[in-house]
Amino acid sequence: MSNGTPSVRVLYFASARTTIGHSSETISLPTTPFPLASLITLIANKYSSRGAEAVLRTCRWSVDNTLIEIDELIEWTLHGREEVAAIPPVSGG
């Protein structure tokens, strides 16, 4: 984030972390504002060889600890410095 390019920190949990291969990363935004849905597509494309799209499609997403509704993914825009989390479905027993 220090190079002046807007970026976000993305956290991956559970199966998303396993698929992506690490628990977090910083991603530069190509433009701002940048739709959250476009960030998800960018990540899916970056890790397409690992089958990321299938896992990311099932995730809930949060931005700065606010859960984003599925129908808001296109409307929700990122401007840089946000913390975005990919949260796969969980179950208990």
Curated annotation (Swiss-Prot):
Q: Which SUPFAM superfamilies match?
A: MoaD/ThiS (SSF54285)
* Metabolic or biological pathway, per its Swiss-Prot or TrEMBL entry: Cofactor biosynthesis; molybdopterin biosynthesis
Where are residues bearing 1-thioglycine located in the sequence?
A: 93
Describe how it is modified after translation: C-terminal thiocarboxylation occurs in 2 steps, it is first acyl-adenylated (-COAMP) via the hesA/moeB/thiF part of UBA4, then thiocarboxylated (-COSH) via the rhodanese domain of UBA4.
Q: Where is it chiefly localized?
A: cytoplasm
Alphabetized, the UniProt keywords read: Cytoplasm, Molybdenum cofactor biosynthesis, Nucleotide-binding, Phosphoprotein
The cellular component terms of Gene Ontology attached to this UniProt record, alphabetical and capped at eight, are:
molybdopterin adenylyltransferase complex; molybdopterin synthase complex
Q: Which domain of life is it from?
A: Eukaryota
Tell me which Gene Ontology terms the entry assigns under biological process. Answer: Mo-molybdopterin cofactor biosynthetic process
GO molecular function terms listed in the Swiss-Prot or TrEMBL record: molybdopterin synthase activity; nucleotide binding
- Which residues are modified to Glycyl adenylate? 93
Q: Which InterPro entries match?
A: Beta-grasp_dom_sf, MOCS2A, MOCS2A_euk, Mopterin_synth/thiamin_S_b
Location in the cell reads: Cytoplasm
Q: What protein family does this chain belong to?
A: Belongs to the MoaD family. MOCS2A subfamily.
Q: What does this protein do?
A: Acts as a sulfur carrier required for molybdopterin biosynthesis. Component of the molybdopterin synthase complex that catalyzes the conversion of precursor Z into molybdopterin by mediating the incorporation of 2 sulfur atoms into precursor Z to generate a dithiolene group. In the complex, serves as sulfur donor by being thiocarboxylated (-COSH) at its C-terminus by UBA4. After interaction with MOCS2B, the sulfur is then transferred to precursor Z to form molybdopterin.
Q: How does it assemble?
A: Heterotetramer; composed of 2 small (MOCS2A) and 2 large (MOCS2B) subunits.
Name of the protein in question: Molybdopterin synthase sulfur carrier subunit
The species this protein belongs to is: Mycosarcoma maydis
